[in-house]
């Protein structure tokens, strides 16, 4: 066995031993205390001596925003750091009762306008929208290597969608469904010169087109890598690749994106997917791909240019790594990229400066590897500080491993040096982690969050379904110190810590905002001004009800419609007081929506039940809140 092969592979015995241990540990629910060995457990009963405190006193503000994914809940959660207090939830792929997301016309437009034709047809008898989502990997937009406060992007693994959230109003304004690929797992955004592209991994392999004509012919299955234009929210291009794509990241020069891959065997069962000792990362040459699109070197599939990036393509390179790598994370020095081994106890470090020579065929794929330290069992994701250190989650060991990149490179060259600085027990089984400003050139090395998949005994027992456990770790000193445990409902997959100076939300909607422009246009067509209108307009069996709201009264205290009319209610909050949100709910009609200061919200429904139906303000906005109500009178159909 050559030295290169020795460094890049696990032996069959090592691989099966690791896999068996993973399975046994998972089955028995072993926690970090049993697996940690001689590692340090550094729990803080408050702030460590000389360390930082998570306390934010009443009336004071957190230093950072944390944008948490929620997995199968389908929303984004905003948390303050270091307090770890939940501040707000942004509904995206889910149906939200409080705000009316998924019910209001404005939200339904966002949820439906980006659907693929076949799914639009599929959903016709299912309420026209997907009722579930699996939101992963929320990442803010960049300009010149740091967050610019414009947008947040995330992916939906359940229904192959990508969303964009406006950070000025903290609302989702665009959702698109990706053609040709099957699910999205792994999303990152272009860091330089700006976002730019949103890179999306197609995890599962399916036939293209996926129309049932090749159900069991796995040779027709393909995985797709997608670049979405983050400004237009249209697919810019796609690349067909070998294997299943997992996670993705990109460089700080705007030249390359790279994805981890499992199932290089292209199997359909667990045993088949694990049969090889190696998988790979795929490196995408952005300039060459853009030239391919410009020169027509692609096949158009479902209206999108699809480039062949399988083995042998000039647009991609495949670098072998140990079996089933998971996370891939670019270091803040702009040079190094770390692929995390998952089934291997190692992480693989690449030097992006070598990728030019790799694509020019001047070096072999493994020549781009500059380190491959062994850290522990189940490395999944890596974060960074401002001192050249990396922090890798070890799922099976229930630990965070702090290690030094330069020392790992020295060890790879044969020096007798240990790159590991510390191992910290976390509670329990960490997946993603993230450091403060840790994906930007402005990383500050203060805080790390470990998103742990199990909480076990950390909280009061709440029944069989238990919360996740997000642990806040002080990394400002030489030693990592846990300073806070925070429970999360199902189920965070990644989080991003952004300094508050980068985000500048408004407190009032602008009346010129495009979010409710359709309502403004309809009112104008009816000869009305939404800021003043309190009228009912009938157009055949379609009725449009316009009303203002100013606490504690709606502009209309009653309106009359006929049974089976299609009713659209437009409510405009004309209050100019910060934090004075109104609601509009109709009793026993399944209607409720949020109406923020200076915003218009609308809802359309069929008045199928005759009778008297009270509507009321569902958000507490005034001492006379209970009296802020009115009547919808539905006249029965004439015999």
Swiss-Prot record:
Sequence positions that bind Cu cation Z3: 137, 432
Keyword Nucleotide-binding: no
Residues that coordinate or bind Ca(2+) 1: 453, 468
Cofactor: Ca(2+); Cu cation
Keywords of the record: Calcium, Copper, Metal-binding, Oxidoreductase, Periplasm, Signal
GO cellular component, one term: periplasmic space
Post-translational modification: Predicted to be exported by the Tat system. The position of the signal peptide cleavage has not been experimentally proven.
CDD domains: N2OR_C
Binding-site residues for Cu cation Z2, renumbered to this chain: 136, 185
Reactions catalysed according to its record: N2 + 2 Fe(III)-[cytochrome c] + H2O = nitrous oxide + 2 Fe(II)-[cytochrome c] + 2 H(+)
Chain spans, region COX2-like: 541-639
Enzyme category, top tier: oxidoreductase
The family this protein is said to belong to: Belongs to the NosZ family. In the C-terminal section; belongs to the cytochrome c oxidase subunit 2 family.
Subunit structure: Homodimer.
Known function: Nitrous-oxide reductase is part of a bacterial respiratory system which is activated under anaerobic conditions in the presence of nitrate or nitrous oxide.
Name recorded for this polypeptide: Nitrous-oxide reductase
Source species: Brucella melitensis biotype 1 (strain ATCC 23456 / CCUG 17765 / NCTC 10094 / 16M)
């Amino acid at each position: 066995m050559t030295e290169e092969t020795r460094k890049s592979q696990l032996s069959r015995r090592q691989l099966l031993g690791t896999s068996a241990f993973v399975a046994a540990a998972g089955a028995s629910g072993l926690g970090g205390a049993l697996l940690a060995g001689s590692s340090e457990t550094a729990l803080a009963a408050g702030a460590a001596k000389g360390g930082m405190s998570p306390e934010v006193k009443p009336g004071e503000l957190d230093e950072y925003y944390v944008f948490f994914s929620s997995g199968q809940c389908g929303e984004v959660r905003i948390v303050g750091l270091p307090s770890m207090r939940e501040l707000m939830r942004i509904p995206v792929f889910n149906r939200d009762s409080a705000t009316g997301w998924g019910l209001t016309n404005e939200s339904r437009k966002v949820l439906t306008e980006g659907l693929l034709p076949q799914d639009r047809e599929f959903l016709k008898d299912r309420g026209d929208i997907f009722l579930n989502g699996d939101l992963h990997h929320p990442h803010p937009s960049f300009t010149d290597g740091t967050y610019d406060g414009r947008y947040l992007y995330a992916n939906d693994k359940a229904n192959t969608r990508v969303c964009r959230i406006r950070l000025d109003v903290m609302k989702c304004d665009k959702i698109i469904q990706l053609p040709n690929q099957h699910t999205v797992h792994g999303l990152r955004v272009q860091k330089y010169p700006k976002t730019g592209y949103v890179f999306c991994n197609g995890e599962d392999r399916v036939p293209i087109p996926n129309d049932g004509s090749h159900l069991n012919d796995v040779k027709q299955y393909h995985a797709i890598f997608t670049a979405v234009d983050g400004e237009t929210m249209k697919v810019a291009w796609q690349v067909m690749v070998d294997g299943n794509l997992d996670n993705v990241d990109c460089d700080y020069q705007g030249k390359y994106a790279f994805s981890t891959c499992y199932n290089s065997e292209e199997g359909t069962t667990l045993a088949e997917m694990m049969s090889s000792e190696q998988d790979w990362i795929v490196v995408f040459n952005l300039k060459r791909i853009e030239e391919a699109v410009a020169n027509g070197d692609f096949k158009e599939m479902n209206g999108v240019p699809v480039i062949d990036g399988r083995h042998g393509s000039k647009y991609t390179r495949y670098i072998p790594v140990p079996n089933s790598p998971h996370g891939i994370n670019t270091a803040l020095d702009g040079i190094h990229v770390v692929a995390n081994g998952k089934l291997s106890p190692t992480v693989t470090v690449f030097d992006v400066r070598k990728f030019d020579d790799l694509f020019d065929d001047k070096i072999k794929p493994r020549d781009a590897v500059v380190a491959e330290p062994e850290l522990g069992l189940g490395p999944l994701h890596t974060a960074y500080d401002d001192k050249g250190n990396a922090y890798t989650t070890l799922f099976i060991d229930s630990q965070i491993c702090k290690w030094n990149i330069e020392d790992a490179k020295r060890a790879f060259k044969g020096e007798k040096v240990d790159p590991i600085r510390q191992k910290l027990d976390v509670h329990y089984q960490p997946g993603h982690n993230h450091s403060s400003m840790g994906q930007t050139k402005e990383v500050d090395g203060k805080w790390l969050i470990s998103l742990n998949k199990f909480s076990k005994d950390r909280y009061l027992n709440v029944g069989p379904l238990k919360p996740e456990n997000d642990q806040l770790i002080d990394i400002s000193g030489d030693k990592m110190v846990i300073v806070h445990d925070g429970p999360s409902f199902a189920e965070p997959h990644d989080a991003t810590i952004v300094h508050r100076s980068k985000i500048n939300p408004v407190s009032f909607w602008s009346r010129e905002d495009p979010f409710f422009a359709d309502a403004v246009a309809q009112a104008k067509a009816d000869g009305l001004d939404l800021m003043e209108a309190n009228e009912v307009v009938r157009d055949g069996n379609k009725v449009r009800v316009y009303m203002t709201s100013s606490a504690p009264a709606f502009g209309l205290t009653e309106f009359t419609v006929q049974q089976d009319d299609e009713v659209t209610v437009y409510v405009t909050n004309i209050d100019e007081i910060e934090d004075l949100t109104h609601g509009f709910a109709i009793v026993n009609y399944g209607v409720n929506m949020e109406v923020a200061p200076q915003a218009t919200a609308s809802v359309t429904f069929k008045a199928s039940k005759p009778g008297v139906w009270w509507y009321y303000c569902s958000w507490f906005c005034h001492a006379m809140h209970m009296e802020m109500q009115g009547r919808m009178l539905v006249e029965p159909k004439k015999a």
